[in-house]
Amino acid sequence: MSLAGIAFIGYAVWFFIRNFSDDFLELGIGHDQVSVGKDQIEAFSPSLYDYISHLHLAVAGFLAATGLAAALLSWFGVRRGYMWAWGAAVAVPVLGLAVALPSHYPYGFDTIGHLGLIYLATAIFVVGAVIAFKGIREQSR
């Protein structure tokens, strides 16, 4: 669980850096999903460009915060057998993913290049959560 939390932080850093690069758009989003790039967006509307940039930074911040919460709750609470820490460590990324993921599918932003790393980190997290849950349950018997 902690490893997946750290992976979420890594993805957030990557997301943050891309905002200031020539790529600008999110990882795995290209001309097949968005027909214009950074320069065209900025030329069309500097204020729209600034708004999109601020959203990228906000998402990066929330991804990092989610990863940090999951990692710290897992490392300092779940490892000690606290069920409340397990519940919180699971709830934090589940809430974030439940809000964020569905919006990707109707607009064609569900590419493996865009969501693949999140899917991988989520799979690692789920495996860790199941293993940790079994361990906590055995401790409480």
Regions found by a protein language model. Name each.
Residues M1-A7, V59-F62, T66, A85-G96, ...:
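Hydrophobic alpha-helical transmembrane segments of polytopic
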